[in-house]
Amino acid sequence: MTDHKPSKSLPKATAKRLPQYYRLFKSLVEENVTRTNSQLISEKIGVDAATIRRDFSLFGELGRRGYGYETKVLRDFFGELLGQDQETHIALIGVGNLGRALLHYQFQDRNKMRITQAYDISGNPLVGTQTDDGIPIYNISDLEKNVKKSDIKTAILSVRKENAQEVVDTLVKAGIKVSLNFAPIRLKVPSDVVVQSIDLTKELQTLLFFMNDNKQ
């Protein structure tokens, strides 16, 4: 297989499908399936076969015509792309209802990501304590200083939208280049910083649209 890495110009839609591909090939290997093809992959993940072949072509020769794809090879390939061979430490900013749920989410049971620090404002009674798993919850004023001293490379923002820009600015100063944002606001960041935003209200409204549309 040709050794290819994705370029920074990899389409965003393709990048979003990478975890799906990794999970599928990991599952197939665990089921002792040694080989598959784009049609079978399509049936498993609900993406059309042509799109899958186009995605894979961006990385070089991941398979062979008439032979298909070796599941273990592609599991390892996509796992490496997604950094599954290294542990990723995450800072969580905002320990409200959503933040507390994220603190208890077992990222590490599924991959090598784990929250190692959490932050909130001084008015939150959890500040100065730690979770049952030993994750310290710091005052937000210590964010830049602590992150700079740590090996944290990514962050999750679970804060009010009016505070989100200030928080991401602080993260950028601390050297964080990748963040997941749950605040319903578009954040302004430098061109070398990536922010993936998830607006839960917007996602639910979209689902409601499809639900109502199906009734007609």
Swiss-Prot record:
- Please provide, alphabetically and separated by semicolons, the GO molecular function terms listed in this UniProt record: DNA binding; DNA-binding transcription factor activity
Location in the cell reads: Cytoplasm
A Pfam family this chain is assigned to: CoA_binding
InterPro entries found in the cross-reference section? CoA-bd, NAD(P)-bd_dom_sf, Rex_DNA-bd_C_dom, Tscrpt_rep_Rex, WH-like_DNA-bd_sf, WH_DNA-bd_sf
Q: Which of this chain's residues are annotated to bind NAD(+)? A: 94-99
What the record says about family reads: Belongs to the transcriptional regulatory Rex family.
Record's function text: Modulates transcription in response to changes in cellular NADH/NAD(+) redox state.
Its name, as the record gives it, is Redox-sensing transcriptional repressor Rex
Species classification:
Bacteria, Bacillati, Bacillota, Bacilli, Lactobacillales
